[in-house]
C-alpha cells in the first residue's frame, strides 16, 4: 500500500516521548514522490480536496454493501470527546491479530484538542456518513495548543521511522483529506475526510489485545523510506500503486490521520474480485471489490489509534518496519490503494478454489506483472540510505495478461521497493541469472510475494553465476509463463506469488541449505507449526536471538506447479530450511484465526515442494559465501499470546550448522568427531549422535589438543566405545584406533602426571614456607621479649669527655674485652678479642703519638710568651716534625720515632706540655710519648690499657651490647652528633637510663669548636638541655664525673685554679656527707664535690619528681673503677627499668 510518513522537525533519533509544544516543532512540507498517482475516472486529488459528497451519496464498503445516511455536521463529532471505539468484525467475526496493528505513532503537532474518531457504518449504530471537516479545524497552525494523547502510543526504537527530516518551521499549513483510489485500476477515486473530535477519554481496545503502551516486534516496522531522491525509492508495497505525496506550502509533510473505518468507492467498470475473507494474504488491504460472489456483513478495519511521531531512540536508517497496513494518520495527503489482491483471501476461499490455488492454477493479476524496478542494496556496498536501483526485466506474464490495459501504468513502471540491508531474500519469478557465489547474501534483490511482480536478480551477476545454476534456472522458469498468461478474470482471486513456479519458490525460500552458503537464510516457514519461521537468528554474536513464534507461511511457497512429490524426509528438510530463512518482508502470523489454521497442511506441503525446487536451482552456488542474517528481536508478549508456538520439526540435515545454531554439545561433538576419521559430512554422524555419546566423545577432550591423541588413552572410555559404540556405528573404528601398535603416549596423561608433580612440589613448598613463617614468628617473639628485658643506655656528654672510653671499658669488663679478662664468654666477645681488631688499634695509637708531638712542637711558637728549646741542636728535629704534620697516610719511618723521642726528652718541650691547657692536646699524649720505644717495634700489640687510652674522634653512633649477671645491656654512643642533637634525640625516648659523661679535669680547657667556650661550662649547658628535654623528662640520668685522675693532678699542681674559671668555688665548702677516697687530698675532694653540686643544682632546680640524677666519680681509663661504678649503677638501672614498664 502507499503511505506517507510524516515526522515533525524535532523528532530526531534519540528524542523519545517528547511531547510537542505549541510553536516548538517546525512543520514540513509534503515531499513529492517519484512518479504520478494512479489515474482514475473520477475527480483528481486536487479536486477532491474541494469537493464534498452529496448527502445521500452511497458509500460502498469492502463487502458489497452501501451505507447511506443523512448528512451530518462534522461538529457533532468534534463535540463528542468520550466517544468509544467499537471494533467491528471482518467477515462476521474477524479480529486482526496484534501484529497487524500500525507500528507508528500519530501525533498532531498543533491540532489542539481534536482527535481522530472511528466512523462505524451500518448496523453499528454510529454515524455512517462521510463527514467533512471545517477547513479551520484541519489547519495545523491553529494556536490552540498541542496536548499529548492520554492513550498515545510510543513506539520502541526499532519501530520508529528510519529517516528524519529537518525542515524549516512554517506558520500555517492546510492538510488535504485522505485520498483513496478505486479498487480497480482506472476507477474513480473516493476521498474520505475525517472529523477530529475532542480528546477521547478512553483509547483502549477490547478485542485486539493491545494496551496503551503496545510495542510491536521490530520485523513489523517500515523497511523503506519515502524520500525517493535521498533514500532510494518511493514505491509502496507490491500490489499497490505508488503514493503521490502532496506538497504543501513551505515543503512540509502534513500529518496523516484516518479513522479506523475506511469506506472506499469502487470504480464503475471495476471487474469483480473474489474475496473469500480477510485472512491469508501477505498484506492486508483496506479495499474490497463491491462485486463479491457472495454477500457478507460489512467489513470494517479496526485498529488502535495510530500516530506517526518522531523516531525513537536508537533507530537507524536500516531499521525494518512492517508495512502490512497503510500508515493512516489523522490528516494528510491522500493514500492511494490499488486493486491488488488481498492477502487474507486465501484463508476463507472455498476448498476447491483454495486447492486450485495451492496447485498453481490461480490466475495472476495483470498488475502484478508490471513491476519493473527493484532497488538492491548489497551488504557492504553502498550506504543504506542510498540504495542502488536495479532495473530488471519484467515478467513475461505482463504481455499476456488480458487486463493489462486496465492496470495502473505508473504503479507498474515506477514502483520501486526500497529494501533495507537486512532483507536479502528474494522472490524472482523469471530469474535470468543467479547471484554470484561470493556475495554475502543469497539473492540480493527480492520482491514482495504479493507485490504483483517477480523481479529477477540483476543482470550484472550473469558473469559470476555458475553454469549449473543457469541451467537449473532456465527449465524452472518455463512453467511461470503458463499460469501467468491466463487472463486476470478475477483480479483479486489469488496473488501472483501463490502461483510462482519452482524458480520463484526457490527465491522465496531464501538461501539453499545444501550448499552451506545460507544455512540460516531459508524462507519464512510455510507451515505455522514452525514457531521460529518468522526469521532466523540474527548474527553469530547474538546466539540467544530467537525467531518470532507467530510467523506464518510465506505465500510464495504456497504453490509450485512443477514440483514433484517429496518424501517425508525431504519435507522435513524443507521445513527446516524454511525455519532458518531470512526475514520475509511483510509476512505475519495467521494462526489467530480459525480459517488460517484450516489451510496449514496445504501450506506445509507447498513449502516442502518449494524447498525441493530451491535445492535444485541453487545446486551450483558456492558454499563459501558468508551467510546473511537479519537483525530481529523476540516478539512482544501480545504476539506470543496470539500465536502460541507449535512443535518444532526434526533437525535439518545441513552439512555444517551455523555457529549460532549449534549449541555447546554440537560444537564439542564436531570437534571430537574426528576420532573415527570418517571422511564424510556430518549429515550421518550428527543425526545419529545422542547426548550420552557426545559426553563419551568429549569426556577427556581438552581444548587445543590434537584429536589423534584422544583415543586409546582412557580405559573407561575405550570400554564404553567398545560396548556401546556399535549403537553409533563407531565401534570398529574406535577399536582399531585403540589397538594400534604404534600408539604414542597420551599427552594428556603426561600432562596430568606433570601437573600432579607440580602440585606435590607446590604443597611441599607451601609446607616449607609455612614452617619458615612459624620460625620467623617465633624469632620475632623472642626478639620482642629480649627487647623488653634489655636495658638500653644512652651515652651523652661534651666532646672529649671520655664516652668512648666508657664503652671500651664495658667491652673490657663484660664482653671479654680485648684481652679476654673480666667478662662473659660468648661468640661476640671472642670475635672482638681477635688480633685483627687489635691490629687496627695499633695504627690509631701511632696516629695519637704523631698528633701529640706535632701539637706540642707547634704550640711552642704560638704560646705567649713562646717556649724555647732547651737544646738548640734539636731545631732540625722540630723542622722535620713540622714538615710531616699534614702528610696523609704517613708510614712512620724509624727516624720519626728517633726525632720524636729526642724532642720529648728536651726540657723546653716538657715546659710547653705543662701549658697544655692553653691549647688542645689529647689526654693520652703523655702516656703514648712515654712508650715510644714499645710502639716503634714492628711486632707491637696494644695492651688492654693502651686500647682505652687510644683517642679516636667519634663521628657517628656506636652501640655495644653486653651482659652482666644475665642482664642484657645495650649502650649507644652518640657523642659525634652534637650539632644535630635536637633532631635525633627524640629517637631515644624509650631508653632505660641516660649516662651523662663529664670531663671533670676540663675546667681550664676550651672546646675544639670554639676557643672561647670553657669545656666544663659547655658540659653544664648540655646537661641542662638534656634534663629539660620534653622527650626525656621521664628518664633518669646517671652522671659520670670522669677523669678524676687528671683533676687531682691539676688541683695538686696548683697551676690552674678552679676559682679563676668558676668564682663560686672560692665560697664553696665541702659538704658533710662527702666521702673522700682513701689517701685523697682534701683539696681534691673539695674540687670534685664542687663540680658534682653544680650539676645537681640543675637537676634539683627543675626536677618534677619523675626522674632523678645519680652522680658517680669515675676514671675511664681505670678498668676496676669502671667495674665498681657500673655495679653500683646496675641496681639503679634495674629499678628504672621496672618503673618504665610500670612494674614498680
Curated annotation (Swiss-Prot):
InterPro entries to which the protein is assigned, alphabetical: Gprotein_alpha_S, Gprotein_alpha_su, GproteinA_insert, P-loop_NTPase
Binding positions (GTP): 797-805, 947-954, 973-977, 1042-1045, 1116
Chain intervals for the UniProt region annotation (G2 motif): 946-954
Region span, G5 motif: 1114-1119
Ranges annotated as biased composition (Basic and acidic residues): 343-356, 370-381, 743-767
Coiled coil stretches, renumbered: 745-772, 837-863
Principal place of residence: membrane
Any Gene Ontology CC annotation: nucleus
Gene Ontology MF, one: ionotropic glutamate receptor binding
Modified residues (ADP-ribosylarginine): 951
Highest rank taxon of the organism: Eukaryota
Modified residues (Phosphoserine): 1102
Residues that coordinate or bind Mg(2+): 804, 954
Its job: Guanine nucleotide-binding proteins (G proteins) function as transducers in numerous signaling pathways controlled by G protein-coupled receptors (GPCRs). Signaling involves the activation of adenylyl cyclases, resulting in increased levels of the signaling molecule cAMP. GNAS functions downstream of several GPCRs, including beta-adrenergic receptors. XLas isoforms interact with the same set of receptors as Gnas isoforms.
Name of the protein: Guanine nucleotide-binding protein G(s) subunit alpha isoforms XLas
Amino acid at each position: 500500500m502507499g503511505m506517507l510518513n510524516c515526522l515533525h522537525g524535532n523528532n530526531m533519533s534519540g528524542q523519545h516521548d517528547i511531547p510537542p509544544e505549541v510553536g516548538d516543532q517546525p512543520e514540513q512540507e509534503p515531499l513529492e514522490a517519484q512518479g504520478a498517482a494512479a489515474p482514475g475516472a473520477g475527480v483528481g486529488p486536487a479536486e477532491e480536496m474541494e469537493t464534498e459528497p452529496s448527502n445521500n451519496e452511497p458509500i460502498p464498503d469492502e463487502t458489497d454493501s452501501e451505507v447511506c445516511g443523512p448528512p451530518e455536521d462534522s461538529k457533532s463529532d468534534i463535540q463528542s470527546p468520550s466517544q468509544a471505539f467499537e471494533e467491528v468484525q471482518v467477515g462476521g467475526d474477524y479480529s486482526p491479530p496484534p501484529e497487524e496493528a500500525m507500528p507508528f505513532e500519530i501525533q498532531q503537532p498543533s491540532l489542539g484538542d481534536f482527535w481522530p474518531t472511528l466512523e462505524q457504518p451500518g448496523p453499528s449504530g454510529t454515524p455512517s456518513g462521510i463527514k467533512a471537516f471545517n477547513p479551520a479545524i484541519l489547519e495545523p497552525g491553529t494556536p490552540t495548543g498541542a496536548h499529548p494523547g492520554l492513550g498515545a502510543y510510543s513506539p520502541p526504537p526499532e519501530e520508529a521511522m528510519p529517516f528524519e527530516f529537518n525542515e524549516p518551521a512554517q506558520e500555517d499549513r492546510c492538510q488535504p483529506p485522505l485520498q483513496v483510489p478505486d479498487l480497480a485500476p482506472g476507477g474513480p477515486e473516493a476521498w474520505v475526510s475525517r472529523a477530529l473530535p475532542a480528546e477521547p477519554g478512553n483509547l483502549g481496545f477490547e478485542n485486539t489485545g493491545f494496551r496503551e503502551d503496545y510495542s510491536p516486534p521490530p520485523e513489523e516496522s517500515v523497511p523503506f523510506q519515502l524520500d525517493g531522491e535521498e533514500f532510494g525509492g518511493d514505491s509502496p508495497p507490491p500490489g499497490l500503486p505508488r503514493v503521490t505525496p502532496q506538497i504543501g506550502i513551505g515543503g512540509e509533510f502534513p500529518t496523516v490521520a484516518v479513522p479506523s473505518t475506511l469506506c472506499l468507492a469502487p470504480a464503475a467498470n471495476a471487474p469483480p474480485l473474489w474475496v473469500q475473507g480477510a485472512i491469508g494474504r501477505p498484506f492486508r488491504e483496506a479495499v474490497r471489490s463491491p462485486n463479491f460472489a457472495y454477500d457478507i456483513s460489512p467489513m470494517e478495519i479496526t485498529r488502535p489509534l495510530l500516530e506517526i511521531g518522531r523516531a525513537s531512540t536508537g533507530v537507524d536508517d536500516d531499521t525494518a518496519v512492517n508495512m502490512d497496513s497503510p500508515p493512516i494518520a489523522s490528516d494528510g495527503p491522500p493514500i492511494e490503494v490499488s486493486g491488488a489482491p488481498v492477502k487474507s483471501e486465501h484463508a476463507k476461499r472455498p476448498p476447491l478454489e483454495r486447492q486450485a490455488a495451492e496447485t498453481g492454477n490461480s490466475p495472476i493479476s495483470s498488475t502484478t506483472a508490471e513491476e519493473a524496478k527493484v532497488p538492491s542494496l548489497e551488504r557492504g556496498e553502498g550506504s543504506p540510505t542510498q540504495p542502488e536501483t536495479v532495473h530488471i526485466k519484467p515478467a513475461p506474464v505482463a504481455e499476456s495478461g488480458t487486463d493489462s490495459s486496465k492496470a495502473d501504468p505508473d504503479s507498474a513502471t515506477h514502483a520501486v521497493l526500497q529494501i533495507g540491508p537486512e532483507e536479502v531474500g528474494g522472490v524472482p519469478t523469471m530469474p535470468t541469472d543467479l547471484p554470484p557465489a561470493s556475495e554475502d547474501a543469497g539473492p540480493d534483490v527480492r520482491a514482495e510475494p504479493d507485490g504483483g511482480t517477480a523481479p529477477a536478480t540483476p543482470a550484472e551477476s550473469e558473469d559470476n553465476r555458475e553454469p549449473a545454476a543457469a541451467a537449473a534456472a532456465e527449465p524452472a522458469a518455463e512453467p511461470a509463463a503458463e499460469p501467468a498468461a491466463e487472463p486476470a478474470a478475477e483480479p483479486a482471486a489469488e496473488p501472483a506469488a501463490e502461483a510462482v513456479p519452482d524458480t520463484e519458490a526457490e527465491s522465496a525460500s531464501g538461501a539453499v541449505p545444501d550448499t552451506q552458503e545460507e544455512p540460516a537464510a531459508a524462507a519464512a516457514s510455510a507451515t505455522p507449526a514452525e514457531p521460529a519461521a518468522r526469521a532466523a537468528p540474527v548474527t553469530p554474536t547474538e546466539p540467544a536471538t530467537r525467531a518470532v513464534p507467530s510467523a506464518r507461511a510465506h505465500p510464495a511457497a504456497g504453490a509450485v506447479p512443477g514440483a514433484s512429490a517429496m518424501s517425508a524426509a525431504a519435507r522435513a528438510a524443507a521445513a527446516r530450511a524454511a525455519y532458518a530463512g531470512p526475514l520475509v518482508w511483510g509476512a505475519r502470523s495467521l494462526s489467530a484465526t480459525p480459517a488460517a489454521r484450516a489451510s496449514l497442511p496445504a501450506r506445509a506441503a507447498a513449502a516442502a515442494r518449494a524447498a525441493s525446487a530451491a535445492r535444485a536451482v541453487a545446486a551450483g552456488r558456492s558454499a563459501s559465501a558468508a551467510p546473511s542474517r537479519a537483525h530481529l528481536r523476540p516478539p512482544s508478549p501480545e504476539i506470543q499470546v496470539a500465536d502460541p508456538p507449535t512443535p518444532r520439526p526434526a533437525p535439518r540435515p545441513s552439512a555444517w550448522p551455523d555457529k549460532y545454531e549449534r549449541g555447546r554439545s554440537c560444537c564439542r561433538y564436531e570437534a571430537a568427531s574426528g576420532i573415527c576419521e570418517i571422511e564424510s559430512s556430518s549429515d550421518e554422524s550428527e543425526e545419529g549422535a545422542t547426548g550420552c555419546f557426545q559426553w563419551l566423545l568429549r569426556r577427556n577432550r581438552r581444548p587445543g589438543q590434537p584429536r589423534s591423541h584422544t583415543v586409546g588413552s582412557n580405559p573407561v572410555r575405550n570400554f564404553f566405545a567398545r560396548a556401546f559404540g556399535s549403537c553409533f556405528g563407531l565401534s570398529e573404528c574406535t577399536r582399531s584406533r585403540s589397538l594400534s601398535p604404534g600408539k604414542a603416549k597420551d599427552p594428556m596423561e603426561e600432562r596430568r602426571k606433570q601437573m600432579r608433580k607440580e602440585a606435590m612440589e607446590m604443597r611441599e613448598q607451601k609446607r616449607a614456607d609455612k614452617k619458615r613463617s612459624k620460625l620467623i614468628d617465633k624469632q620475632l617473639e623472642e626478639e620482642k621479649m629480649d627487647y623488653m628485658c634489655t636495658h638500653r643506655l644512652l651515652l651523652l656528654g661534651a666532646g672529649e669527655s671520655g664516652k668512648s672510653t666508657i664503652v671500651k671499658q664495658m667491652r673490657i669488663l663484660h664482653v671479654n674485652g680485648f684481652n679476654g679478662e673480666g667478662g662473659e664468654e660468648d661468640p661476640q666477645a671472642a670475635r672482638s678479642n681477635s688480633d685483627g681488631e687489635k691490629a687496627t688499634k695499633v695504627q690509631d695509637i701511632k696516629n695519637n703519638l704523631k698528633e701529640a708531638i706535632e701539637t706540642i712542637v707547634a704550640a711552642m711558637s704560638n704560646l705567649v710568651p713562646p717556649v724555647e728549646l732547651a737544646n738548640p741542636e734539636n731545631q732540625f728535629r722540630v723542622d722535620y716534625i713540622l714538615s710531616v704534620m699534614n702528610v696523609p697516610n704517613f708510614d712512620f719511618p724509624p727516624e720519626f720515632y728517633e726525632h720524636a723521642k729526642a724532642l720529648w726528652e728536651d726540657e723546653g718541650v716538657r715546659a710547653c706540655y705543662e701549658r697544655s691547657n692553653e691549647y688542645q692536646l689529647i689526654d693520652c699524649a703523655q702516656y703514648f710519648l712515654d712508650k715510644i720505644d714499645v710502639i716503634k717495634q714492628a711486632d707491637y700489640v696494644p695492651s688492654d690499657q693502651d686500647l682505652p687510652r687510644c683517642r679516636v674522634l667519634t663521628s657517628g653512633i656506636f652501640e655495644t651490647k653486653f651482659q652482666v649477671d644475665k642482664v642484657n645491656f645495650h649502650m649507644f654512643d652518640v657523642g659525634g652528633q652534637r650539632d644535630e642533637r635536637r633532631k635525633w634525640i627524640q629517637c631515644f625516648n624509650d631508653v632505660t637510663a641516660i649516662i651523662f659523661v663529664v670531663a671533670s679535669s676540663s675546667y681550664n680547657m676550651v672546646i675544639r669548636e670554639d676557643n672561647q667556650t670553657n669545656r666544663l661550662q659547655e658540659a653544664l649547658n648540655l646537661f641542662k638541655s638534656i634534663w629539660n628535654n620534653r622527650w626525656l623528662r621521664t628518664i633518669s640520668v646517671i652522671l659520670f664525673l670522669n677523669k678524676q685522675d687528671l683533676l687531682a693532678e691539676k688541683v695538686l699542681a696548683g697551676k690552674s685554679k678552679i676559682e679563676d674559671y668558676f668564682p663560686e668555688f672560692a665560697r664553696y665548702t665541702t659538704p658533710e656527707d662527702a666521702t673522700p677516697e682513701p689517701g685523697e687530698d682534701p683539696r681534691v675532694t673539695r674540687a670534685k664535690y664542687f663540680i658534682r653540686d653544680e650539676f645537681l643544682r640543675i637537676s634539683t632546680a627543675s626536677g618534677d619528681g619523675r626522674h632523678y640524677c645519680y652522680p658517680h666519680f669515675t676514671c675511664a681509663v681505670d678498668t676496676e673503677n669502671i667495674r665498681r661504678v657500673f655495679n653500683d649503677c646496675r641496681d639503679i638501672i634495674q629499678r628504672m627499668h621496672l618503673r618504665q614498664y610500670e612494674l614498680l
